[in-house]
C-alpha cells in the first residue's frame, strides 16, 4: 500500500469530528500495514440510515486503500441496548428480533462497504460461552465511578432516573469485542466516545496495543433539530425507494444542505465552498442544490439511472402536481369500502393510526384530488388516495 499523505489527510479531516490519537493513526496508515478497522452495530432496528452512512463511508475510503473492515454484529449487546445518549433505559430485544434485524442490516451495510474486504463477526462467538466468572473478571477491571463519568449516566443519576446493571456492562462488552478481534482502529459517532475509549483501556490492560479511535459527527435529521433517528421519523433510509429518498432530501432545511454534502457525498471541498458562497449571496436556489444532493446520494446507493428517474418523478408529481402512473395499488378487504384511516394504514401510506390522523388534521390527505378532513370518509374501488406531498395509492 503506497498512499500519499494528502489522501490520508483528506480522509482524517473531512467528515471527522475527532481522532484519538491522530498522529499515531496517521503513522499506522503510512506504515503500509493492513489495518483492522472495527465497526460495531447493534441490530436493534433493521434499517441503516444516512446517520450510519457517515462512518460507513470512512470505512469504505480506507478499504479502498487496502485495509480490512471487521464488522461486529452485536447480537448480545443489542439485547441490552446501547445507552449512549439515552435518557431512559432501553427495552431488551429477543434473540429472534435481533437475528431478523441483523439479516436486513447486513444487506444494507454492503450497499456502502465492500463485502469482499469485510470480516463479519458475531458477538455470540465469544459471549455464547461466557460464564459468570468471566463477567465478574471483566467487570472487575472497571469501577462504578468510571461508568458514572459518562455524561448520559451522570444526568440520569442526578435526575434519579434508573440505570440498569446491564447498561453499566455495555461499554465493557463493547470494549471486549475490540480485544477479541484485535482492533487497530474503532469507528463511531461522537456520542460513542466513552465506549470507544474504554476499548483502548481494556486492550492496554490485556497487553494489546490500544486501538485508535475515529469519531464522526452526529448527522442532524430531516427535521433540522434532532439526531437522525428512525424512532423520531426524521431519517433517510439507505434502502428506501429512490423516489422516497429523493423526496426526503428535498424536505431538509436549507441550513443542512452543506453538512449533508460534506458528510455523505464525494463532492469536492472547493465545490461545497462555492455552494456556500452562492447561498450566502442568494445566487442559487436551494432547491437546485437539494436536487444535486439527492442525485449524488442515489447514484451512490443505486445508480445514475435511478437518480434521473427519481428526479423526473419529483418534477412531475410534486412540482407539477401530476398523478403518477406507477403508483402502488392496495386491495380492499373483501372488495368492501373501508374508512380512509384504515386504508392509509393498509396501503402503507402511514404506519399508525396516530400518523394517519395527523395527516388528516394537517390537510395532507386527498381522495381523487379532493382534500379530506373527516376520518370516517369511505374509500371505494378505483379511488386514488394521496397522503403527504408525494405518496399515492390506488384502491382496487
Curated annotation (Swiss-Prot):
Per the UniProt entry, the Enzyme Commission number(s) are 6.1.1.1
Q: Which UniProt keywords apply?
A: Aminoacyl-tRNA synthetase, ATP-binding, Cytoplasm, Ligase, Nucleotide-binding, Protein biosynthesis, RNA-binding
Q: Where is this motif: 'KMSKS' region?
A: 227-231
MF terms from GO for this chain are:
ATP binding; RNA binding; tyrosine-tRNA ligase activity
- Fetch the Pfam families from UniProt: SYY_C-terminal, tRNA-synt_1b
List where in the cell it is found: Cytoplasm
Q: What class of enzyme is it?
A: ligase
Q: Name one GO cellular component term.
A: cytosol
Which reaction equations make up its catalytic activity? Answer: tRNA(Tyr) + L-tyrosine + ATP = L-tyrosyl-tRNA(Tyr) + AMP + diphosphate + H(+)
Q: Which residues bind ATP?
A: 230
Q: Where is this motif: 'HIGH' region?
A: 43-52
**InterPro entries per record:** aa-tRNA-synth_I_CS, aa-tRNA-synth_Ic, Rossmann-like_a/b/a_fold, S4_RNA-bd, S4_RNA-bd_sf, SYY-like_C, Tyr-tRNA-ligase, Tyr-tRNA-ligase_bac-type
Q: Where is the S4 RNA-binding domain?
A: 338-396
Q: Name one GO biological process term.
A: tyrosyl-tRNA aminoacylation
Q: Which CDD domains match?
A: S4 (cd00165), TyrRS_core (cd00805)
Under PANTHER family, the record lists:
TYROSINE--TRNA LIGASE, TYROSYL-TRNA SYNTHETASE
Q: What does this protein do?
A: Catalyzes the attachment of tyrosine to tRNA(Tyr) in a two-step reaction: tyrosine is first activated by ATP to form Tyr-AMP and then transferred to the acceptor end of tRNA(Tyr).
The family classification in the record reads: Belongs to the class-I aminoacyl-tRNA synthetase family. TyrS type 2 subfamily.
Task: Give the multimer and partner information.
Answer: Homodimer.
Protein name, per record: Tyrosine--tRNA ligase
Task: Record the organism.
Answer: Dehalococcoides mccartyi (strain CBDB1)
Amino acid at each position: 500500500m503506497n498512499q500519499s499523505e494528502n489522501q490520508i489527510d483528506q480522509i482524517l479531516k473531512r467528515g471527522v469530528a475527532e481522532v484519538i490519537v491522530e498522529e499515531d493513526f496517521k503513522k499506522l496508515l503510512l506504515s503500509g500495514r493492513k489495518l483492522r478497522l472495527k465497526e460495531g452495530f447493534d441490530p436493534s432496528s433493521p434499517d441503516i440510515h444516512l446517520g450510519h452512512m457517515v462512518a460507513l463511508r470512512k470505512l469504505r475510503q480506507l478499504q479502498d486503500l487496502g485495509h480490512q473492515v471487521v464488522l461486529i454484529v452485536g447480537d448480545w449487546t443489542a439485547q441490552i441496548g446501547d445507552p449512549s445518549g439515552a435518557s431512559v433505559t432501553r427495552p431488551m430485544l429477543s434473540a429472534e428480533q435481533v437475528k431478523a434485524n441483523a439479516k436486513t442490516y447486513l444487506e444494507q451495510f454492503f450497499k456502502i462497504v465492500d463485502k469482499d474486504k469485510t470480516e463479519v463477526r458475531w458477538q455470540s462467538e465469544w459471549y455464547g460461552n461466557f460464564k459468570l466468572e468471566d463477567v465478574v473478571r471483566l467487570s472487575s477491571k472497571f469501577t462504578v465511578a468510571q461508568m458514572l463519568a459518562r455524561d448520559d449516566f451522570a444526568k440520569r443519576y442526578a435526575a434519579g432516573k434508573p440505570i440498569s446493571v446491564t447498561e453499566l456492562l455495555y461499554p465493557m462488552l463493547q470494549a471486549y469485542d475490540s480485544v477479541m478481534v484485535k482492533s487497530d482502529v474503532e469507528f463511531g459517532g461522537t456520542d460513542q466516545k466513552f465506549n470507544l475509549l474504554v476499548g483502548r483501556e481494556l486492550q492496554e490492560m490485556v497487553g494489546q496495543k490500544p486501538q485508535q479511535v475515529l469519531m464522526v459527527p452526529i448527522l442532524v435529521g430531516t427535521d433540522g433539530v434532532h439526531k437522525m433517528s428512525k424512532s423520531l421519523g426524521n431519517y433517510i433510509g439507505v434502502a428506501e425507494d429512490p423516489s422516497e429518498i429523493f423526496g426526503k432530501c428535498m424536505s431538509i432545511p436549507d441550513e443542512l444542505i452543506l453538512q449533508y454534502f460534506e458528510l455523505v457525498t464525494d463532492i469536492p471541498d472547493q465545490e461545497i465552498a462555492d455552494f456556500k458562497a452562492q447561498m450566502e449571496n442568494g445566487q442559487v436556489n436551494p432547491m437546485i442544490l437539494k436536487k444535486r444532493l439527492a442525485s449524488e446520494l442515489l447514484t451512490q446507493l443505486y445508480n445514475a439511472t435511478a437518480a434521473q428517474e427519481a428526479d423526473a418523478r419529483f418534477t412531475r408529481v410534486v412540482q407539477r402536481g401530476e398523478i403518477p402512473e406507477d403508483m402502488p395499488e392496495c386491495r380492499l378487504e373483501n372488495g368492501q369500502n373501508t374508512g380512509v384511516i384504515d386504508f392509509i394504514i393498509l396501503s402503507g401510506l402511514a404506519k399508525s393510526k396516530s400518523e394517519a390522523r395527523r395527516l388528516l388534521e394537517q390537510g395532507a390527505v386527498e381522495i381523487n384530488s379532493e382534500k379530506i378532513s373527516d376520518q370516517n370518509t369511505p374509500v371505494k374501488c378505483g379511488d386514488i388516495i394521496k397522503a403527504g406531498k408525494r405518496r399515492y395509492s390506488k384502491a382496487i
